[in-house]
């Protein structure tokens, strides 16, 4: 397994729309393992392949406190099941150190493939619903900062650009 480099906003590669996975093979499963290792090391609760500069529709997440519930979503899709919205304070490994409130549908139906390529479907609420929507946004080239005002988004971009310059 390997720790992968996580792209950070405003890197334009984060805006790439991911392509569907055609075949779930050993290379895809190795990527999934590397993504889990990267996510746990960061640490985070979710990671989309786009964030590690692999533009395939793959998401990993683990919402447990003790890293005991790894979940894989290949070619995930979701549909809102209610018009009711929940507001969560979201953060992101690609926007380190920033947390902002984002409104999202509170209940969604998820369709995806598991790490063996088997299709599954489930209804999600709460944190799982928020996370799958957040990670699917990544696969579509969107970040949580896109839900913020232009002023807030620009302020975050400028702070991260300054940090990147100082680290260079």
From Swiss-Prot:
Hydrolase in keyword set: yes
Active site, per annotation: 135
EC number(s) recorded for this UniProt protein: 3.5.1.88
A biological process from GO: co-translational protein modification
Superkingdom as given in the UniProt entry: Bacteria
InterPro entries in the record: Peptide_deformylase (IPR023635), Peptide_deformylase_sf (IPR036821)
Reactions that this protein is recorded to catalyse: N-terminal N-formyl-L-methionyl-[peptide] + H2O = N-terminal L-methionyl-[peptide] + formate
Keywords attached to this entry: Hydrolase, Iron, Metal-binding, Protein biosynthesis
Comment on bound cofactor: Binds 1 Fe(2+) ion.
Residues that, per the record, bind Fe cation: 92, 134, 138
Pfam family, one: Pep_deformylase
Cofactor: Fe(2+)
GO molecular function term, any single one: peptide deformylase activity
NCBIfam families: pept_deformyl, PRK00150.1-3
Function, in words: Removes the formyl group from the N-terminal Met of newly synthesized proteins. Requires at least a dipeptide for an efficient rate of reaction. N-terminal L-methionine is a prerequisite for activity but the enzyme has broad specificity at other positions.
Family per record: Belongs to the polypeptide deformylase family.
Protein known as: Peptide deformylase
Organism: Pseudomonas aeruginosa (strain ATCC 15692 / DSM 22644 / CIP 104116 / JCM 14847 / LMG 12228 / 1C / PRS 101 / PAO1)
